[in-house]
A protein has these predicted regions:
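C-terminal compact regulatory domains
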Residues: 1-166
Length: 166
């Protein structure tokens, strides 16, 4: 039921927040505003991802399937998005096809970091992602700390220490 899903999401977000506040995490330098395009067909998953990213001051925009993702990227002003989080299994167009379309679109499409997010942690999946031109591969459920490491290296970000950590 929707209510139960809501409760699960709350629990998931609460646990994720506790994990983050438990150890003095670093945070992104606010001078660098990060905006992601997130291809995700599941409402609950997107809400959780948006909430977790928001804790790091990262904003995102959703595409509910691969086709919408390709279209949004195509229509956007250059440099609108810093990276794309790409769910693998989506209706209409899956993440692999969407990534291939974006890679072939233009110079920015060829360069933008695309991070695969997938429930299947199989080796063959990683190979398919790499063949489609994706830069990294993260399993679901979404581990925000792993994503931060990946974004930090792909986007060449500076971390600043959290001011409130003694």
């Amino acid at each position: 039921s929707m209510h139960r899903k809501g409760v699960e999401a709350e629990k998931y977000i609460k646990e994720a927040k506790e994990k983050i506040s438990a150890k003095p995490e670093k945070k992104f330098n606010k001078l660098k505003r990060i905006h992601l395009l997130v291809a995700e067909d599941n409402d609950l998953n997107y809400e959780v991802e948006q909430e977790l990213l928001g804790m790091y001051g990262i904003t995102c925009e959703r595409a509910a399937n691969g086709e919408i993702c390709v279209d949004k990227f195509h229509r956007a002003e250059p440099k609108t998005y810093d990276a794309i989080l790409m769910d693998m299994q989506m209706p209409v167009m899956d993440g692999i096809d969407a990534a291939k379309h974006i890679r072939q679109m233009d110079a920015e499409g060829a360069e933008i970091p695309i991070i695969a997010v997938t429930a299947n942690a199989f080796k063959s999946d990683e190979e398919h992602c790499a063949e489609a031109g994706m830069n990294a591969h993260l399993p679901k459920p979404f581990d925000i700390n792993k994503l931060m490491e990946v974004l930090t290296s792909l986007l060449d970000l500076e971390y600043t220490e959290n001011e409130n950590v003694q």
